[in-house]
Swiss-Prot record:
This is Calreticulin. PANTHER family: CALRETICULIN (PTHR11073:SF16), CALRETICULIN AND CALNEXIN (PTHR11073). It is found in: Endoplasmic reticulum lumen; Cytoplasm, Cytosol; Secreted, Extracellular space, Extracellular matrix; Cell surface. It comes from Sus scrofa (Pig). Calcium-binding chaperone that promotes folding, oligomeric assembly and quality control in the endoplasmic reticulum (ER) via the calreticulin/calnexin cycle. This lectin interacts transiently with almost all of the monoglucosylated glycoproteins that are synthesized in the ER. Interacts with the DNA-binding domain of NR3C1 and mediates its nuclear export. Involved in maternal gene expression regulation. May participate in oocyte maturation via the regulation of calcium homeostasis. Residues 198-308 are annotated as: P-domain.
Length: 417
C-alpha cells in the first residue's frame, strides 16, 4: 500500500530525528561493569576504581558510579563501544562527576580515544581525540578542560571555563556541531559557547603583519612634548640638604681628639627637586603607528575541524591526590535534546535528595561535635574541681602535720622542763 506523501515525509522526519546513542553507562547491573571496563596494565600501581554511591546520595542504586579509592594515584580505566565518526553530525559527550572528598588536587575529566587504542596499555601519553571535564588543583586551577587533538597536536581552549568545586554531583556536557561551533554546559546550563576556529588555535591566523611595512622615520607617537619656550628659573637650583643653622658645636668638643666638627645636615626647605619643562600638545603627533596587516598566505580554512574519523573508547586517565571522586551517567550521542533529557532524568532527579542527605549529615555532625565539646568542657570542669579538692585535702593534711609537729615539739619541751 502506498502511503500519502505528507505521511511518508512525516515518518521519514521521525526516523531522522531518532537519536543515536553510541555509548551509555549508568552502572545499574552491579558488578557487570567489570566486563565492560578494562584496567590498564601500563603501570603496576594504578589506583583502583570501585562501584559506590558514596557517603551521601539521592538514590543509593541510581547514584552508584566508578569511585577512585586510593590516594595519590594515577588511574587508567576505559570502556569500548562500536566505532563511529561524527562527520556531518553533532557530537554530545556527557557525564556526572562528584568530588565528595572535597578534592584538593585531581582530575575529573574523560578522554575519547580512536579505535587503535590498546586499552591494556592506556596511559597519560596515549593519543586521544578529545579530552573534556573538570580539573582542580589548589586555588589556582579550577577549570573545565576542552582539548582537541588536531593533526596530531593537542590544542587547548583559549578561554577559562570555571568548574564546580563543591562536594555535590554535577553534570558536564560538551556539544560539538558540524558547523564548527561548540557549547559547554554544566548542570544543563550553558557556561560557554562559540566557534572552534575562534576559541582554539587550530589554524594559522587569517591576518599577519605586513613584513614589508615599516613605520615612517618621521612618525611621531609622542602626544606631549617639552615646551621649547619654557626655561628653568635662575633661582631653581638649590641643594637638597643643608647644614643645620641651629646646630652648635658641643662645648666639650675636642678637635684634636674628635676631629673637625661639622654641623648635621637637614632637608633644605628651598629645595625644589629636578626641574622639568612644562608639557604641551605635540603639533606633530600622529598617534600610535599600527602595523598594517595582510592576508596570511599560510592560512587555509578547514570546515572539518570538528570531525574525527572514529571514536571507539571512553577512558578515565587521571591523577588524584585525594581519592573519592565518583563518575556516572556517561553518554555519547548525536542528539542535544536527548542528552539534556537524559541529564534531567538522572542527575536532575536525584540532586535535591543528595543535598538533603548531605545537609542532614552535616547537621548531625554539628550536633555531635557540640555534644562532644560540651562533654569535654564538663570533664574539664570535673577535673578542675577534683584538682581543687585534692589541693584542699593536701593543704589540710599539711596543716594537720604542722599541728602534730608543733604538739610534739611542745610536749618535748615540757618533758625537758
Amino acid at each position: 500500500m502506498l502511503l500519502p506523501v505528507p505521511l511518508l515525509l512525516g515518518l521519514v522526519g521521525l526516523a531522522a530525528a531518532e537519536p543515536t546513542i553510541y555509548f551509555k553507562e549508568q552502572f545499574l547491573d552491579g558488578d557487570g561493569w567489570t566486563d565492560r571496563w578494562i584496567e590498564s596494565k601500563h603501570k603496576p600501581d594504578f589506583g583502583r576504581f570501585v562501584l559506590s554511591s558514596g557517603k551521601f546520595y539521592g538514590d543509593q542504586e541510581k547514584d552508584k558510579g566508578l569511585q577512585t579509592s586510593q590516594d595519590a594515584r594515577f588511574y587508567a580505566l576505559s570502556a569500548r563501544f562500536e566505532p563511529f565518526s561524527n562527520k556531518g553530525q553533532t557530537l554530545v559527550v556527557q557525564f556526572t562527576v562528584k568530588h565528595e572528598q572535597n578534592i584538593d588536587c585531581g582530575g575529573g575529566y574523560v578522554k575519547l580515544f580512536p579505535d587503535g587504542l590498546d586499552q591494556t596499555d592506556m596511559h597519560g601519553d596515549s593519543e586521544y581525540n578529545i579530552m573534556f571535564g573538570p580539573d582542580i588543583c589548589g586555588p589556582g586551577t579550577k577549570k573545565v578542560h576542552v582539548i582537541f587533538n588536531y593533526k596530531g597536536k593537542n590544542v587547548l581552549i583559549n578561554k577559562d571555563i570555571r568548574c564546580k568545586d563543591d562536594e555535590f554531583t554535577h553534570l558536564y556536557t560538551l556539544i560539538v556541531r558540524p558547523d564548527n561551533t561548540y557549547e559547554v554546559k554544566i548542570d544543563n546550563s550553558q557556561v560557554e559557547s562559540g566557534s572552534l576556529e575562534d576559541d582554539w588555535d587550530f589554524l594559522p591566523p587569517k591576518k599577519i603583519k605586513d613584513p614589508d611595512a615599516v613605520k615612517p622615520e618621521d612618525w611621531d607617537e609622542r602626544a606631549k612634548i617639552d615646551d621649547p619656550t619654557d626655561s628653568k628659573p635662575e633661582d631653581w637650583d638649590k641643594p637638597e640638604h643643608i647644614p643645620d643653622p641651629d646646630a652648635k658645636k658641643p662645648e666639650d668638643w675636642d678637635e684634636e681628639m674628635d676631629g673637625e666638627w661639622e654641623p648635621p645636615v637637614i632637608q633644605n626647605p628651598e629645595y625644589k627637586g629636578e626641574w622639568k619643562p612644562r608639557q604641551i600638545d605635540n603639533p606633530d603627533y600622529k598617534g600610535t603607528w599600527i602595523h598594517p596587516e595582510i592576508d596570511n598566505p599560510e592560512y587555509s580554512p578547514d570546515s572539518n575541524i570538528y570531525a574525527y574519523e572514529n571514536f571507539a573508547v571512553l577512558g578515565l586517565d587521571l591523577w588524584q591526590v585525594k581519592s573519592g571522586t565518583i563518575f556516572d551517567n556517561f553518554l555519547i550521542t548525536n542528539d542535544e535534546a536527548y542528552a539534556e533529557e537524559f541529564g534531567n532524568e538522572t542527575w536532575g532527579v536525584t540532586k535535591a535528595a543528595e543535598k538533603q542527605m548531605k545537609d542532614k549529615q552535616d547537621e548531625e555532625q554539628r550536633l555531635k561535635e557540640e555534644e562532644e565539646e560540651k562533654k569535654r568542657k564538663e570533664e574539664e570542669e570535673v577535673d578542675k574541681e577534683d584538682e581543687e579538692d585534692k589541693d584542699e585535702d593536701e593543704e589540710e593534711e599539711d596543716e594537720k602535720e604542722e599541728e602534730e609537729e608543733e604538739d610534739a615539739a611542745a610536749g618535748q619541751a615540757k618533758d625537758e622542763l
